[in-house]
Amino acid sequence: MAREKQIIECVPNFSEGRNKDVIKQITDEVESVKGVKLLDVDPGEATNRTVVTFVGEPSVVVEAAFRCVKKAAQLIDMRQHHGAHPRMGATDVCPLIPVAGITLEECAVLARQLAERIANELQVPCYCYEAAAKTPERKNLAICRKGEYEGLPQRMTEAAEAPDYGARDWDEQLARTGCTAVGARDFLIATNFNLNTTSTRRANAIAFDVREKGRPMREGGSPIGKPMKDEKGEVIMQPGTLKATKAIGWFIDEYGIAQVSMNITDINITPLHVAFDEVCRCAQNRGIRVTGTEIVGLIPKRTLLEAGTYFLKKQQRSTGIPEEDIIKIAIMSMGLDDLKPFNPREKVIEYLLEDTDKTPKLIDLTVKEFANETSRESPAPGGGTISAYMGALGAALGTMVANLSSHKAGWDARWEEFSNWAEKGQAIQAELMVLVDEDTEAFNRIMSAFGLPKGTDEEKAARSQAIQEATLFATEVPLHTMKASYKVFELCRAMAEEGNPNSVSDAGVGVLAARAAVLGAGLNVKINASGLKDKETAARLVAEANELIEKANEAEAEIMKIVEAKL
């Protein structure tokens, strides 16, 4: 299966919030890195601090982070800095945050690598915090920033206070730049739950019910009783029901309603939909209704997909439906458009990145445009691309039968069985849709390699190697298409045997499409493998393709017998 694209977010805080020219020069460094999307620049006058947010694939985000830290070190003199916010360097903090396809632990590794590079190349000492911390106590940013900038000269002389990377004596350069804290943390979601009340007190009561910190325990259990204290004289708290959350209640003049305002600090512990349901429950206990949800800032796509899937399962409806449909369910279920229209293309990080990438894709064409593009006097898109699309259509047909079966009257007890098949079908379809464009890209790589200069012996050698690498890639892509398309047979066999009998012909067409995809992609494996100088590799790839062709022919014959018997 095609691996989910890795995306991370970086939110560096720079110790300059007043000089717009300096801020612009720093953010220009971010935008100079191809593949990075600058999402937000938030300068603060009183804090004299600017929070910058950008996203992209890990390698380019880390590069952009390094460049903006470098520019900040050149432009900001900490000896002249004064502001209301704690700080210890020109770049005060630089956290990396997982968004999609990557774990917090992997981000922590990247953060340490970034910290080491900053220390080695820029001579800016770095402390690692939160998930990137090298010692338990340094997970706390406040420990890393102890004494702030003014305390650094003393800390640089103490072994226990030495930075994780770049320990050095205090000098004029270090006095200018200060130190930087580089870390990795989970994605934070800021959200407000809309209430059908104007009472801030009741909104606060709901917030205290759910937030992890909870509320003070009071004598007699009365809301006006004195707070109870432990033997140390500290107020005893009664924890709320939602871990990894902070919340308060407030009234918003703009909307004329009260809200429960919440920060979810770890969406793996408390996903948005879980928070929504719990706030609804606690509100209902107090005679109040949640009318909708307001998302502040941006969110990862998985937040909406998990929510939509959750609400579909509550309805006992198939979850093997297109991504857009799942997100629509999430929007409706949590009332994300209660106060104003909610556009996923403007609120979901992955979609913003997609819209930034202007590379034209075949899968974005209409059916007519795709057919016309294929018919034109150009070798790509060609048979490999069409094979991948045939496989995707086969998977789509099998998935359609699964969804029809999941919702068939009288089959309610089997909804989950067919929903699971539909999910598998959607995954196969998504994998093959990626290969539609990847096959054309593979051909274009070969053409680009043949276009390389060949004037000198070095150029000839480099060109020859590039051609072989591109040819190998162009052989492996259709082989991937064959493997993905072959998985369609299992889906369509199950639907032919167990699915809605009224749709058995659709399962049959899915089988025929899958066979065409496997055999068609096999032709591409063979013709491209013939261009490989490594004949051992070529023979191995062709043998693998021939095996898949044989298995596809057998599977098609077996399943079509089942289909024909039910017509």
Language model features with spans:
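Preference for long, well-ordered alpha-helical segments
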Residues: 114, 124-128, 137-140, 488, ...
